[in-house]
UniProtKB/Swiss-Prot annotation:
Transmembrane segments: none annotated. InterPro entries: Ig-like_fold, MSP_dom, PapD-like_sf, Sperm-specific_class_P. Gene3D superfamilies: Immunoglobulins. It comes from the Eukaryota. PANTHER family: MAJOR SPERM PROTEIN, MSP DOMAIN-CONTAINING PROTEIN-RELATED. The gene is ssp-9. This is Sperm-specific class P protein 9/11. SUPFAM superfamilies: PapD-like (SSF49354). Expressed at higher level in testis. Residues 2-109 form the MSP domain.
């Protein structure tokens, strides 16, 4: 089971902007994920919870509101998805994360 992010880093203007990243499942199992941010005041992530099908991908949009330039990060926790899961947020509470992917975020002036 593996999950990667493409592109692996995010650079957005400190004045605000957005970046789209693709989560790619390189394995044969459906994956469930949850995304945590080191800065919830200036970043919005969509979706926060979700599924990625085997050998599939899922787009994640990172949106930055205006603020001081600084370095932050996203950490994507992932695990094999329960077979009967349809609500990622509810199902994630019942799994133990099997790995993480970190996306460094840089807001530039």
């Amino acid at each position: 089971m593996s999950l990667t992010a493409d592109p692996p880093a995010c650079t957005v203007p400190a004045a605000g902007g957005s970046s789209t990243h693709k989560l790619v499942n390189g394995g044969a199992e459906k994956i469930i994920f949850k995304i945590k941010s080191s800065n919830n005041n200036e970043y919005r992530i969509a979706p926060v919870f979700g599924f990625v099908d085997p050998a599939g991908s899922k787009d994640v949009v990172i949106t930055r509101t205006a603020g001081a330039p600084k370095e932050d990060k996203l950490v994507i926790h992932f695990a094999p998805a329960p077979a009967d899961a349809t609500d990622a947020q509810a199902a994630f509470a019942a799994v133990t994360p099997a790995g993480t992917v970190t996306i460094p975020m840089s807001a530039t002036a």
